[in-house]
Regions:
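C-terminal motif of bacterial Sec signal peptides marking the signal peptidase cleavage site
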Residues: 14-17
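Conserved C-terminal helix/tail region of periplasmic/extracytoplasmic solute-binding proteins
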Residues: 302-331
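Short, surface-exposed acidic
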Residues: 161-165, 268-279, 316-323
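Pocket-lining segment of extracytoplasmic ligand-binding domains
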Residues: 93-94, 173-177, 181-266
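Bacterial signal peptide processing site
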Residues: 19-21
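Short, glycine-/small- and polar/acidic-enriched structural segments
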Residues: 28-170, 177-180, 184-188, 207, ...
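Secondary-structure end/capping motifs
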Residues: 232-312
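Sec-dependent signal peptide recognition
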Residues: 2-9
Length: 331
């Protein structure tokens, strides 16, 4: 009987302790605010910092549950401009016609410090600079700004833009089209397509747009947000960007671990691990030369690109000076 009373006493103590612990846990739990965030494309190394921030709990620390999504049929910019999503990833060059028409959207951070896009070509054509592109086949999306970019870098080197043959590029994978001879050169991003070409042992030449026209060192990709969202949720936007910044800073210091985190959230990349790691090693050096200033957009560079668009009448409407970007939400 005495043993039974002792056992009963300890059972009661255990139940009281468990109940107390449960109450404490519920009290300490912070209700997270769910916020949608749209990618521009399939998950890739441009996005690594987002997934690192999610994995490391940086969003949770800010009271945010960031729901990272791929856009379905409508473009990321369209969804954000029309207030169907608050934030997402886009590009300064593609944003130009939207801003010219007065779209209510603002770039709030640059994911990569400098423009890493450029021209890749089959090595057999010995393309060493833009002039060498004469008489070759160009895989194009036939976008006025895109074509003007190629034109200026060719003319800056004494080349004749009219001597290229334009071939419609209907595939996201320009590398395969070059390998198959559909066209001879195309505009790509080094951190994905050039690394992919190297992984496939393709012999190619590459140069950056920015090396042949300083106007073309625009920001790509960028994080954009709906203006009404920013006006009504300024502090929330700062929290999100604070967490994202920490994610990219971690990826800068830990590229291989960051690549593995990306693969965890995008398992379709698992069979391309070596490629993803090499892509990440390249981009981790490109996100920011000073990681404390990750995301910062320089007004001079932003305006220089849009002034070039205005001066060459590439759009019907002009883009106002200093429009479409803000560093106010970065801390």
């Amino acid at each position: 009987m005495k043993k039974f009373k002792v056992l009963l006493f300890f059972m009661i103590l255990f139940l009281v302790a468990c109940n107390s612990k449960e109450k404490t846990t519920k009290t300490n739990q912070v209700e997270l605010k769910k916020v949608d965030f749209l990618l521009d494309w399939v998950p890739n190394t441009n996005h690594t910092g987002l997934f690192v921030a999610k994995e490391k709990g940086y969003f949770s620390e800010e009271g945010i549950d960031l729901d990272i999504k791929q856009p379905a049929n409508e473009s990321t910019s369209g969804l954000i401009i029309n207030n169907k999503a608050p934030m997402g990833i886009y590009f300064q060059d593609y944003l130009a016609p939207k801003l010219a028409k007065g779209a209510e959207v603002t770039a709030v951070a640059a994911i990569i410090e400098n423009n890493t896009s450029g021209i890749i070509s089959n090595k057999k054509f010995n393309v060493e600079n833009p002039k060498d592109l004469e008489n070759l086949k160009y895989g194009t999306w036939d976008i006025p700004i895109e074509l003007a970019m190629l034109k200026i870098i060719m003319e800056n080197q004494g080349g004749d833009f009219s001597k290229i043959q334009k071939i419609p590029n209907t595939d996201d994978n320009s590398i395969t089209n070059i390998a198959n001879g559909l066209f001879d050169f195309a505009g790509i991003y080094y951190g994905w397509d050039k690394i992919m070409a190297d992984e496939l042992k393709m012999e190619t030449n590459f140069f950056y747009y920015k090396d042949y026209a300083e106007e073309l060192n625009f920001y790509s990709p960028i994080i954009i947000a709906n203006n009404n969202y920013l006006k009504e949720n300024a502090e929330e936007a700062k929290k999100i960007l604070r967490a994202i910044k920490k994610g990219y800073q971690y990826a800068i210091d830990n590229p291989e671990e960051a690549a593995n985190i990306l693969i965890k959230y995008a398992p379709e990349l698992k069979n391309k691990k070596d490629f993803v790691v090499n892509s990440q090693k390249y981009l981790s050096k490109e996100y920011a030369s000073n990681k404390e200033k990750w995301g910062y957009i320089e007004a001079e560079r932003w305006n220089k690109f849009y002034n070039w668009i205005n001066d060459n009448d590439l759009l019907k409407e002009k883009i106002p000076e200093n429009s479409g970007f803000s560093n106010d939400y970065l801390e």
